[in-house]
From Swiss-Prot:
This is Urease subunit beta. Transmembrane segments: none annotated. The lineage of its organism: Bacteria, Pseudomonadati, Pseudomonadota, Gammaproteobacteria, Enterobacterales. InterPro entries: Urease_beta-like, Urease_betasu_sf, Urease_subunit. The gene is ureB. It catalyses: urea + 2 H2O + H(+) = hydrogencarbonate + 2 NH4(+). Pathway: Nitrogen metabolism; urea degradation; CO(2) and NH(3) from urea (urease route): step 1/1. GO terms for molecular function: urease activity.
Length: 129
């Protein structure tokens, strides 16, 4: 058995980076949406949050975001400062596409079927586009 050189040993708690960048979600269909924070507080949206159900103060085409999440790495988020307008990339939610919780607007399957935003949602949740 060959001994490691001092340069080859990773220190305790250390890590080794890959030579090539890691890619993800390459085979997923992506849409772009323009989102504006019309509120007076910063809003942070996590990577796997059902984007259709994000904070009411975010203005965007909610119907287009149905069944989708941010196209960012897991455990990360995008922060929208008050007045910010940001273009985001969204991809379909994976797996069985069952969405429960969040803001309880769906609580069921969020697959490819179109969504009708009913009047209570339209009047209480900002909608642009």
């Amino acid at each position: 058995m060959e001994k490691n050189n001092k340069e080859d040993v990773t220190p305790l708690g250390g890590y080794i980076l890959a030579k090539d960048p890691i890619s993800f979600n390459e085979d997923r269909p992506v849409i772009q949406l323009r989102v504006r924070n019309s509120g007076d507080r910063p809003i942070q949206v996590g990577s796997h949050f059902h984007f259709f159900e994000v904070n009411k103060a975010l203005q965007f085409n909610r119907a287009a975001a149905f069944g989708k999440r941010l196209n960012i790495t897991a455990t990360t988020a995008i922060r929208f400062e008050p007045g910010d307008e940001i273009e985001v990339s969204l991809i379909p939610i994976g797996g069985k596409q069952n969405v429960y919780g969040f803001n309880n607007l769906v609580d069921g399957w969020a697959g490819k079927s179109p969504v009708a935003i009913d009047e209570p949602v339209e009047t209480t949740w900002l909608h642009a586009g």
